[in-house]
A protein has these predicted regions:
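Soluble non-transmembrane domains of integral membrane proteins
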Residues: 82-84, 89-352
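Short, Gly/Pro- and small/polar-rich lid/capping loops
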Residues: 54-89
């Protein structure tokens, strides 16, 4: 019995060593390369040029490069007509959301998802734009006067109703905001569809060339997304800012550092900010030139504090704006749900972190686990039952691998007496021992690695399942038996500290 146990311990040790070696080799050869000194200096130079030293809460981002950290209204005569006005709101309602726009800045003040509620507040719907008082969306540029201008500091005009809610039911509806500048106008236009989570957005100069003379502009999403779950620390771990360029996704996460900046150059496919279950993404229109993007992050407070939050900003760098030609974008503002994300860009699901083995686990989750799980959910009313059935299905599918591992372990256990005899026969000749053991394996048809390889093959599937259920909005706020929320931990005892 002791010899059998020693054999089992040896097989277990071999399996652990092999798995550790594979993971170590993967991390060494496939880990992302650190930025070069030249790249770090380029990022620092860009941030020094684009960021103010400080921001006054409640004021728009409008910086005088000569006196960093100060905020003031544009003094250039080209903006005189846009510096005065009254802030009014335009409310737009579709089947899936209610958006509130403002004539102050032509920006978005609220974007309420009608089908989703905040955790612990069933009557309070999720609002993706509540982390900033000035609105999330902004156009920032530097006119010939040299003063950086944020569109949220300007007053816009609109022909849309500011009295009644605009309900979009039959077809797309466009709402345009015009700020009088330079003898013409800066136009920010939104296009709303009756269904879906997408919003069309366009930046256009009308009879003006200030953006062109400024050398382009930045399109900002400011403030990230507010935390909507009970566990703010867990949500911080899953939140971040993202950009996809050259087929690769770059990200920053404040769960690792309290303040982060990253500059990415080249053609940008999309930028995004995310909390655990929701995402706000900006996708440039086809043919629109981009020259890079910047991701900024700042942590406020510490986990456990009431004021704890993570603020992310994405800046899409547009090199020029042709007068009379709108620069088109698509905004995706909704859940991290494959069935919605794929309608806008299949790569948007890459905002979900699947770890260093994502090249294996993400495709498994996206093309196998998610479709099957959603299929079960279409005819089974309880997601708790779906999870149980899904677990049984996975167990059945993995049974051949598990059986193979058990069978190989049993064969190795049966060989233990003969292997012990070989060691006793050649106690001082390890090479002879190894030769005779390999001959014994061949004669008996035993693979010494047969016990750990089947288990190793299951590893990507198990990790994909774990990551999928950890981030799936399908089970968010779904109850089963005594559990009120299948996506949240089930507390057994609340400790007084």
């Amino acid at each position: 019995m002791d010899q059998q146990q020693q054999g089992l311990d040896r097989n277990t040790l071999v399996g652990i060593v092999l798995i550790s070696v594979i993971m170590g080799v993967w991390m060494i050869f496939f880990a992302p390369e650190p930025p070069t000194p030249e790249q770090r200096q380029a990022i620092a130079d860009s941030l020094a040029a684009l960021q103010p030293d400080s921001l006054d809460q409640g004021e728009p981002f409008l910086v005088d490069p000569a006196v960093e950290g100060t905020l003031a209204a544009p003094t250039d005569s080209a903006f005189a007509a846009a510096t005065q006005g009254t802030a009014e709101t335009v409310v737009v309602e579709t089947e899936t959301y209610i958006a509130t726009l403002s004539t102050k800045g032509g920006t978005m003040l609220n974007f309420v998802l009608k089908e989703y509620n905040k955790a612990g507040e069933e009557a309070t719907p999720v609002d993706l734009v509540s982390n900033t008082d000035d609105g999330a969306l902004a156009v920032v540029f530097t006119p010939p006067s040299g003063r950086i201008v944020d569109s949220r500091s300007l007053f816009f005009q609109t022909t849309a109703s500011t009295q009644d809610t605009i309900r979009v039911t039959d077809g797309p509806q466009q709402i345009a905001f015009d700020a009088p500048i330079g003898g013409g106008a800066l136009r920010l236009a939104y296009t709303f569809e009756p269904e879906g989570h997408g919003v069309g957005f366009a930046v256009e100069e009308v009879n003006s060339n200030l953006l062109t003379r400024a050398g382009g502009y930045e399109l900002l999403w400011d403030g990230g997304l507010p935390f909507d779950e009970l566990d703010a620390n867990d949500e911080s771990i899953n939140a971040g800012a993202y950009v996809r360029a050259g087929g690769e996704v770059e990200q920053i996460k404040l769960s690792k550092e309290p303040e982060l900046n990253e500059l990415i150059t080249g053609t940008i496919e999309w930028t995004a900010v995310k909390n655990k279950y929701f995402v706000a993404a900006i996708l440039p229109g086809e043919g629109l030139a981009t020259e890079g993007a910047e991701l900024d992050g700042l942590r406020i407070g510490e986990p456990g504090e009431a004021a704890f939050d993570d603020y992310y900003t994405t800046r899409l760098l547009i090199p020029r704006a042709a007068t009379g030609e709108p620069n088109p974008y698509t905004l995706y503002l909704g859940p991290v749900d494959l069935s919605f994300l794929d309608d806008y860009d299949e790569s948007l699901y890459e905002v979900v972190d699947y770890g260093f083995g994502a090249f294996m686990t993400r495709p498994l989750a996206k093309y196998v686990i998610a479709p099957v799980f959603r299929l079960f959910g279409t005819f089974i009313p309880s997601y708790g039952v779906v999870i149980i059935l899904f677990a049984i299905l996975i167990k059945i599918l993995l049974y051949p691998l598990t059986k193979s591992a058990y069978r190989s372990t049993a064969k190795m256990r049966d060989l233990q007496p003969e292997m012990t005899a070989l060691k006793e026969k050649y106690p001082d000749d390890p090479q002879k021992q190894q030769e005779q053991m390999m001959k014994l394996y061949r004669d008996r048809g035993v693979n010494p690695l047969g016990g750990c390889l089947p288990l190793l093959l299951q590893y990507p599937i198990i990790i994909a399942l774990w990551r999928f259920f950890q981030n799936s909005i399908l089970i968010r706020q779904e109850s089963f038996l005594w559990a009120n929320d299948l996506s949240a931990p089930d507390p057994v005892l609340h400790l007084p500290f």
